UniProtKB/Swiss-Prot annotation:
GN (gene name): iscS
GO molecular function, one term: 2 iron, 2 sulfur cluster binding
Name of this chain's protein: Cysteine desulfurase IscS
GO cellular component, one term: L-cysteine desulfurase complex
Catalytically driven reaction(s): (sulfur carrier)-H + L-cysteine = (sulfur carrier)-SH + L-alanine
Keyword terms of this UniProt record: 2Fe-2S, Cytoplasm, Iron, Iron-sulfur, Metal-binding, Pyridoxal phosphate, Transferase
Length: 403
């Protein structure tokens, strides 16, 4: 067993060796290194063929059409293209947008930018389990609602939203519906037709592919139009200019192909490991699972260990690569905005750790993690005056601290 143990699959995944091997075939002089837009020689033809195959593999996993796949640099760009592109193109319908407070920053900050441009954004509050209900959406949908953007699976707490329910409402209201599926694709079934989704964002590096490549599903039936955010050679049917990186695209296609084949078996194994981890720690005092345990992807468990500072906990668990907050925002010491949105107080939000398990996690690693967590939580609590006060029955919330 190699230390540290990687339990941060929600922030990124290692590239599957099969994917890396595929990627290498499109880089070197001996491989197919051509520009897919070069139509006058075999180097270009072969590269274009590889891109076409990858498009099919990606579409296959989400029950879409290959012509509905637009390649981008990742889910952040896909989210920007979807939200700004649709809001600008359909501005005549209205300037009202709906999203949720627990979305990824790539969605929230894009919506904030549109607010600066004069759009009105409604932010839905999730329930305590992290779920947003179709009823909540129904109550705020308006005739001038141009776009709804709601994630499929939350990156911090792993809860699964009712995308089909939202899709029905948006379709009936003639509102464009965008879904950030970077945390769900390859982990749970996605059928874009059944879900009535217009736009859907994906990233390769959350599904054992390389970083720097993603895609946006853009529905053809009903046809959705977007205003381009990147201008140049008119690649990707004018929606996203820039030379296509064949090696990254082929690798993303391979990652999606493997996911389609192995998703069911991966889920069973990963869920067993998560259950093992949770059973190993949940008999400890003041341990809280954040977000719904029922409506949740197999690989995510987010736990608050009360009376322990999250930052000191991460330091103490130095042999475990885990995250406190999401990777994109954990550089700041603010408590997680996702946990605050579901009603966790600052203390519990600060003491939260996200464990995310993946394809290469072993039982031995989980057992080691349980051992190290139990040992260190006890040690850190022994050093905490708050823990002593709690054990003495003092209500900490009733104390007024002098500044």
């Amino acid at each position: 067993m190699k230390l540290p143990i990687y339990l941060d699959y929600s922030s990124t995944t290692p590239v599957d060796p099969r994917v890396a091997e595929k990627m290498m075939q499109y880089l070197t002089p001996g491989g197919e290194f051509g520009n897919p837009a070069s139509r006058s020689h075999r180097f270009g033809w072969h590269a274009e063929e590889a891109v076409d195959v990858a498009r099919e593999q990606i579409a296959d996993l989400i029950s879409g059409d290959p012509r509905e796949i637009v390649f981008t640099s990742g889910a952040t760009e896909s989210n920007n293209l979807a939200i700004k592109g649709a809001a600008h193109f359909y501005v005549k319908k209205g300037k009202h947008i709906i999203t949720a407070k627990t979305e990824h920053k790539a969605v929230l900050d894009t919506c904030r930018q549109l607010e600066r441009e004069g759009y009105e954004v409604t932010y839905l509050d999730p329930k305590e389990d992290g779920i947003v209900t179709p009823q909540q959406l129904k109550e705020v949908l308006r005739p001038d609602t141009v776009l709804v953007s709601l994630m499929h699976v939350n990156n911090e707490i792993g809860v699964i939203q009712d995308i089909a329910g939202f899709g029905e409402l948006c379709r009936a209201n003639k509102t464009i519906f965008h879904v950030d599926a970077s945390q769900s694709v390859g982990k749970i079934e996605i059928d874009t037709q059944a879900l009535k989704v217009d736009l859907m964002s994906f990233s390769a590096h959350k599904i054992y592919g390389p970083k720097g490549i993603g895609a946006l599903y853009v529905s053809r039936k009903p046809r959705v139009r977007l205003e381009a955010q990147m201008h140049g050679g008119g690649h990707e049917r004018g929606m996203r200019s820039g030379t296509l990186p064949t090696h990254q695209i082929a690798a993303m296609g391979e990652a999606f192909r493997i996911a389609k084949e192995e998703m069911a078996s991966d889920e069973v194994r990963i869920l067993a490991l998560r259950t093992r981890l949770l059973n190993g720690v949940n008999d400890m005092e003041e341990v809280y699972v954040n977000g719904s345990l029922e409506n949740r992807i197999a690989g995510n468990i987010n736990i608050s260990f009360n009376y322990v500072e999250g930052e000191s906990l991460v330091m103490a668990l130095k042999d475990l690569a885990v995250s406190s907050g999401s990777a994109c925002t954990s550089a700041s010491l603010e408590p997680s905005y996702v946990l605050r949105a579901i009603g966790r107080d600052d203390e519990l939000a600060h003491s939260s750790i996200r464990f995310s398990i993946g394809r290469f996690t072993t039982e031995e690693e989980i057992d080691y993690a349980i051992n190290i967590i139990r040992k260190n939580i006890g040690r850190l609590r022994d050093m905490s005056p708050l823990w002593d006060m709690y054990k003495e029955g003092i209500d900490i919330k009733s104390i007024e601290w002098s500044h």
